[in-house]
Amino acid sequence: MSNFEIRVNESYESFKNIDCFENACVVIDNMLRVLENPKNMNIYWKKIVPMIPKAYYDRDPKSDTKEELLYLVCSNSFYLDELFEKAEDEQAINALSKCEQECC
């Protein structure tokens, strides 16, 4: 085995002990908080909010077996970043950055 091959027991070791479900929940918490301001709400977010999986509201990562919450956050990270930047919300920007770096 060469030095560059990844052994099965070593793959994804860097993701060990990272709670991506919780990271995604924090991003959605911030998104919903920012969207409480009517000036931040638009047709795009009106379509996205109903897509938030039940697992988020239950705060139950075991019910999110397909990782739908993380997928929702990661696939919309560009738009979330734009939303948070426009709102000048550092807390939300930092939460998204952490989730992107650790999980997306």
Curated annotation (Swiss-Prot):
Positions of transmembrane segments: none
GO process terms (BP): nitrogen fixation
Record bears the keyword Transport: no
Superkingdom classification of source: Bacteria
Keyword field contains Isomerase: no
InterPro entries reported for this sequence: CowN
Entry keyword set: Nitrogen fixation
Family classification: Belongs to the CowN family.
The protein's role, per its UniProt record: Is required to sustain N(2)-dependent growth in the presence of low levels of carbon monoxide (CO). Probably acts by protecting the N(2) fixation ability of the nitrogenase complex, which is inactivated in the presence of CO.
Name used for this protein in its record: N(2)-fixation sustaining protein CowN
Gene name in the database record: cowN
